[in-house]
Structure formats: C-alpha cells, structure tokens
C-alpha cells in the first residue's frame, strides 16, 4: 500500500477503482492511453461522443460512463488537491475551496450530449 492510498478517505475507494478499471479497459480494448492529465479528458469526451453516436443503449454503457466519470474525478482530485465524498451511493469531489463536483453525473450528461468532463475539470481546477 502506498502512502497516498493510506491517507485517502474511504469515499475514494470505489471511484479510484472505477477509474483504474477504465484506464486498463481503454488501454487494452481501445488502445487509448489515459494518464490522469487534464489533456486526456479531451479524449474521454470524444470517446463518450463516439459511443453516443453509435446509439448504444444506456444500460449497456452505464458502467463505462461511471468509469469515465470516476476517471475525471480522479483528474480533478490530483489537479486540485480535492477529495472524494460519498453519501447514499453517490460520489462527488470536494475541491479545497469547498465546492462539490459530480463527475459521474457529468459523464452521464456527456452521453446525452449535454456535458463535458474536460470543461468540468477546468472549472473545478479554477480557484
């Protein structure tokens, strides 16, 4: 266990795992390398758009969207020094300025054509 894992709140456990899973799945299945950078979120937004254009049923992509949202949340946590919060099965990122962000919900909005994980991260990282 690394020092980072030891000090992370328990609310981070599931989203961190979902993010790691999507990084692995994209590397192995789509040959897309995600490196937890803000820049990588452009590729994530584009991938979600491609999935949407294929008209895949939501139920078929729900887990992938959750993974992409968790990945974006991890980018925000790493960029801003924020932390994951959880309640009632929902997960948010709280940035040091006290604002809350819902990257998993934003990934779902991306799938409907109304969101952007890249822009969410940009806004969350502004102080």
Spell out what each predicted region is.
Residues 1-62:
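N-terminal low-complexity, intrinsically disordered segments
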Residues 10-11, 15-20, 69, 73, ...:
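Small-side-chain structural scaffolding
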Residues 55-98:
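Amphipathic, interaction-prone secondary-structure segments
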Residues 32, 64-67, 107:
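A general marker of short, structured functional hotspots
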């Amino acid at each position: 266990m690394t020092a980072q894992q030891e000090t992370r709140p328990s609310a981070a456990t599931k989203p961190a795992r979902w993010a790691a899973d999507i990084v692995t799945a994209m590397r192995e299945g789509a040959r897309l390398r995600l490196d937890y950078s803000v820049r990588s979120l452009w590729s994530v937004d584009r991938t979600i758009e491609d999935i949407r254009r294929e008209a895949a049923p939501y139920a078929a992509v729900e887990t992938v969207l959750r993974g992409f949202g968790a990945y974006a949340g991890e980018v925000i946590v790493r960029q801003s020094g924020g932390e994951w919060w959880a309640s009632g099965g929902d997960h948010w990122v709280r940035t040091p300025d006290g604002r809350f962000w819902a990257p998993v919900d934003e990934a779902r909005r991306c799938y409907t054509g109304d969101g952007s994980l890249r822009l969410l991260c940009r806004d969350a990282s502004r102080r």
